[in-house]
Amino acid sequence: MHIFSQSPTYPVFVQNPYPVYDKIREGWVYWQDYEMPAIFSYSEIDKLFKNKLLGREAINSGEVNIPKRLQPFYDIEAHSMLELEPPRHTHLRKMVLHAFTSRRIAALGPEIENLCHRLIDNFPNDPFDILSTYATQVPVIVIARLLGVPESMTSQLLRWSNDMVMMYQARRTPELEDRAVTSAIEFSSFMATYIEERRNKPADDLISN
């Protein structure tokens, strides 16, 4: 295994990492900056994903020393489907898939198409940022509708999400960590309240199902 070093925050690498990836695409490397092995070959990655021995959680990794001020974030993250192994992951996945009935899936096509047309029709005449105006709006609105959350909440959902994923960025700072913790607490509190509302007044959405 070759030793490899490349700062993930180096501006030139951030803007265009592909020449570096091309050089290390064959075989495994030990990425010193991350202190872990890494692999970039499609064929090797494909083999790993098909290997039943590969899991999300590290085996016998011991207890992780989480700072007390970050504990609220990790208390929530610990229950994320992205962090779980079977059988908990399998159980949650079945629950989610059960909510996606053939009728609901069939209704999504025209619904998303109408949403896209609506957003496009509202494009301003002056120059604008298509990412914030369109590209981020489509998925967050669709997710809100699936959950049964009011569309007026989409900007709040997006802020919570953006703040929380900052925990996985290379340029993580104490300020970003504090924002992630605050947003995780706010999001969890909102969802707990909203789930209780849906329990008392079910609707045709993912939370009710």
Language-model features: locations:
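Active-site substrate-recognition loop segments, prototypically the cytochrome P450 B′-helix/B-C loop
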Residues: M1-L131, V140-L158, N162-R172, E177-T182, ...
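Conserved cytochrome P450 catalytic core segment spanning the I/J/K helices
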Residues: T133, A184-N209
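Active-site/ligand-binding neighborhood in enzyme catalytic cores
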Residues: T136
